[in-house]
A protein has these predicted regions:
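M16 family metallopeptidases and their MPP-like homologs
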Residues: 20-127, 144-153
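Carboxylate-rich, divalent-cation-coordinating active-site regions
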Residues: 17
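Low-complexity, intrinsically disordered Gly/Pro/Thr-rich segments
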Residues: 130-138
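His/Glu-based metal-binding/catalytic segments typifying zinc-dependent metallopeptidases
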Residues: 1-14
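Short, conserved catalytic/metal-binding micro-motifs enriched in Asp/Glu and His
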Residues: 5, 133, 148
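Amphipathic alpha-helical interaction/coupling elements
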Residues: 6, 83-86, 136
């Protein structure tokens, strides 16, 4: 969903501020979201971080705190605007790019309704409210539903 993509962008801002700027654990935390065209309620949001071995536990703790804060509604209007602006700029650039249109059209030949969704991209993102993001964060960022994968060097204890 577009709201999940915008929530991902807000989370990305918070990850950068906390993990890079405040803690210095990593230069670039990254995250992504996935939804399904087939299963309307299916989707997830994930975070990836490359950190030094001694910072793994503290990094998990920081990510948990950020997710809990988002789920508790700690999203400002300024964060929504700062997260939305680059998405709208990417959409504007894509609409001016033949490659983007070729990709969209190739995905729409069997589902022409996708073209309406493409045309509504910018307005959909512009209409997502802070309250919608807070509701989505409360749904998606529940600690009991989270999974962790840690990849360590072979010689790590």
């Amino acid at each position: 969903s577009r709201a999940l993509a915008l929530l991902r962008a807000v989370f990305d801002l918070k990850l950068t501020e906390r993990l890079r700027e405040a803690e210095g654990f990593t230069y670039s935390a990254f995250n992504s979201s996935t939804t399904s065209d087939v299963y309307p309620d299916y989707g997830y949001l994930w975070v990836g971080v490359d950190v030094r071995l001694e910072n793994v536990d503290a990094t998990y703790a920081a990510i948990d705190e950020l997710a809990a804060a988002l789920a508790a509604g700690e999203i400002t209007e300024d964060e929504v605007l700062r997260a939305r602006r680059p998405l709208l700029e990417q959409i504007e650039d894509a609409f001016e790019n033949n490659g983007a249109w070729l990709n969209w059209l190739s995905q729409s030949w069997d589902k022409p309704e996708r073209l309406d969704r493409i045309r509504a991209l910018a307005s959909d993102y512009a209409e997502i409210s802070r309250d919608e993001l807070i509701e989505m964060a409360a749904d998606y960022l529940q600690p009991e539903a989270s999974w962790r994968v840690t990849i360590l060097p072979r010689d790590a204890e």
